[in-house]
């Protein structure tokens, strides 16, 4: 259905002082604070988690050396989606509008819609991260207290869900440092950045920026700050839906990823019979994760 003069009645008459509702600032590219972006040239991308060897053992004199097997643990797949939106304007609506170039106005609105869809899809990886209906390559949700590995269960979620505070933050950092690889070997892993909804920005500011402990009369230092435990600080994501869930991105490679299959593009064409002009925006991409060790989370208490 095309935008016609009947939908733009006031714009056909003189005396209108202002048009408003499409000039708001928008939140752009917040996904880049969470996901590592790579390009893709195929319908989907797959990444395989490798399982190496267990810890080496003592070889007694004269006894054969132990052999171990390496294998593939699981495969993470990113299937690209096509995101698109279009609108049409009648020839008469373009001709009779008295105030601005109507096509320019709505192509900007189209760009806002495309950007909003991308940010929602990106944030949904975290929004659905505690939901067992949305699983990754290992068959479990992104955040779990029992990711199954050859060397035993490993967690990237607090054992007891907790709101963001000094105690829960320190426990999360301890748990991150205690993670192991698929064979149970210790790995060097650290938190790099906290990701929070807008509701937690004041709590995060106090926890991350004050030099002394928050909410206590003790003259103790703020250990997380003085030790530089989260060097990139915190970022607010306005598309997170759980007001008390919080997350810590780690320095594990191949964690959360965004594959760009086709950058956003726009097309315009006229219809000879009706005179309508059609505008379309289109983009292809995917969001997901390969190694769940790339992020740690708590759904809040």
Q: Each predicted region: which residue ranges?
A:
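Sequence/fold signature of self-assembling virion shell proteins
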Residues: 2-10, 143-182, 188-193, 199-301
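Assembly/oligomerization interface modules of large self-assembling protein complexes
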Residues: 25-83
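Short, charged/polar micro-motifs that form catalytic or ligand-binding hotspots
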Residues: 43, 73, 77, 92-107, ...
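Glycine-rich, often proline-containing surface loops adjacent to acidic residues and nearby aromatics
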Residues: 81-96, 151-153, 188-191
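An acidic- and aromatic-residue-enriched active-site/binding cleft used to recognize and process polar
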Residues: 90-94, 115, 122, 126-130, ...
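Alpha-helical scaffold segments that mediate packing/assembly in large oligomeric complexes
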Residues: 97-105, 112-175
């Amino acid at each position: 259905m095309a935008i016609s003069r009947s939908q733009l009645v006031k714009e056909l008459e003189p005396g209108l002082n202002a048009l408003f509702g499409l000039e708001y600032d928008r939140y752009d590219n917040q996904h880049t604070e969470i996901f590592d972006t790579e390009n893709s040239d195929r319908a989907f991308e797959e990444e395989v988690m490798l399982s190496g060897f267990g810890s080496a053992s003592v070889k007694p004199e004269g006894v054969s050396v132990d052999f171990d097997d390496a294998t593939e643990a699981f495969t993470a797949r990113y299937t690209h989606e096509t995101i698109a939106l279009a609108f049409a304007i009648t020839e008469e609506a373009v001709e009779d509008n008295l105030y601005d170039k109507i096509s320019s106005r709505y192509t900007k609105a189209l760009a806002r819609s495309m950007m909003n869809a991308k940010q929602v899809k990106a944030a949904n990886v975290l929004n659905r991260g505690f939901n067992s209906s949305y699983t990754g390559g290992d068959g479990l949700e992104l955040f779990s207290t029992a990711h199954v590995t050859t060397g035993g269960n490993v967690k990237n979620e607090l054992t007891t869900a907790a709101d963001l505070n000094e105690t829960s933050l320190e426990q999360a950092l301890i748990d991150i440092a205690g993670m192991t690889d698929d064979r149970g070997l210790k790995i060097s892993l650290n938190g790099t950045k906290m990701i929070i909804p807008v509701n937690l920005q004041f709590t995060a500011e106090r926890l991350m920026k004050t030099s002394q402990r928050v909410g206590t009369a003790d003259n103790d230092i703020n250990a997380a700050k003085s030790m530089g435990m989260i060097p990139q600080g915190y970022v607010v994501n306005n598309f997170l839906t759980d007001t008390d869930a919080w997350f810590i991105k780690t320095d594990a490679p191949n964690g959360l990823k965004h594959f760009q299959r086709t950058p956003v593009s726009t097309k315009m064409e006229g219809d000879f019979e009706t005179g309508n002009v059609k505008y379309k925006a289109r983009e292809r991409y995917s969001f997901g994760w390969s190694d769940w060790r790339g992020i740690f989370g708590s759904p809040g208490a």
